[in-house]
UniProtKB/Swiss-Prot annotation:
Keywords: Amidation, Amphibian defense peptide, Cleavage on pair of basic residues, Pyrrolidone carboxylic acid, Secreted, Signal. It is found in: Secreted. Residues 1-26 form the signal peptide. The keyword Signal applies. It comes from the Eukaryota. This is Bombesin.
């Protein structure tokens, strides 16, 4: 009599158990046609997949970005000027920090 190792039986057993669990959860509920309960709600509302993140959104085609005042026209010169301003500001901050550090070191 040959013994089957337990490590070969367990994966097959788990596969069978989980396949039966998934089948039982996928079965549809049979309901009374006169009952307008919550089980039939999905069929009345239609497909609700990926609707929540679209609520309250407008189409981008409806928005004219060029006419909106809140969007400044961005070109290379404007972006370069902004980056130079940010760089100067960062250099000023670092310079102030170093000056404070040197003052504290001398005291």
């Amino acid at each position: 009599m040959s013994a089957i190792p337990l490590n070969r039986i367990l994966p097959l057993g788990f596969l069978l158990i989980f396949s039966f669990i998934s089948l039982s959860s996928c079965m549809e509920f049979v309901e009374d046609p006169n009952n307008q309960g919550g089980l039939n709600l999905q069929q009345r509302l239609g497909n609700q997949w990926a609707v929540g993140h679209l609520m309250g959104k407008k189409s981008l085609q409806d928005t004219d970005f060029e006419e909106m005042e809140s969007f400044a026209k961005r070109n290379v010169e404007n972006m370069k000027a902004e980056s130079e301003r940010e760089l100067r500001h960062a250099q000023l901050v670092v310079r102030n920090i170093l000056e404070q550090y040197l003052k504290n070191m001398q005291n």
